[in-house]
Amino acid sequence: MKRSVFAAIFATFLSAVMHAASAQAVPSYDLRDITVGMPIGDLPNEGYVNLTCAKDPDRKLSAWSAWRDCPADERSRHAVRFDFDPETSQDGTKVAGHPVLLTVLVDDKGTVTGLTIETDPKARLYIRKKAFLLGNQVKSRYGAEGWDCKELQPTAGEQPVGGVFLREVCNKTVPGRTLTVERELFRKPDQDIKSFVDQTLVRITKQTN
């Protein structure tokens, strides 16, 4: 009887510890100083360069405070593209070793409502061919559990690369935001052996009530 009671108490304790560890696994920041849901005014200018409007790359911004200069989309979000400052990031604009394109989305109230991380399609071939692996690193960062993933099938003419075909979409909800990770690795019918689709796209979106 005592063993049964002890086992039940231990199981409850272990479950609580695992739940707490899972909750702690969610990072407080999504990317450096950026957390989706924060006021854009709280984001420092130091460490970030080449701020431009995603829809109008020729329109350069002097600071985050100029986000209103970028045109709004149909959801009233202003998209600002940016890079890491080479003085604070010697490897350039990379996430987990992958060259990336970064975009922050700001609503009319000045709230960061979204963050997009996309592997750079212009990266060198030997780096770009590993681009699909970034998705796994992102999923690991936010905890391996709780992802809802769907594998999509090839369309007409699409072929595997090195024996691997990948078109995957994964979603997960964490406190205050929704995560979407899309990974692709395949060759289109019109691409030669040195050309192929290999990319990861990460979308972090503020949850709405």
Residue ranges with predicted function:
Residues A7-V17:
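Bacterial N-terminal signal peptides
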Residues M1-S4:
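Positively charged n-region of N-terminal signal peptides that target proteins for export
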Residues S65-L115:
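Mid-chain, structured segments of secreted extracytoplasmic proteins
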Residues A23-D69, D108-N209:
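Non-cytosolic coordination micro-motifs
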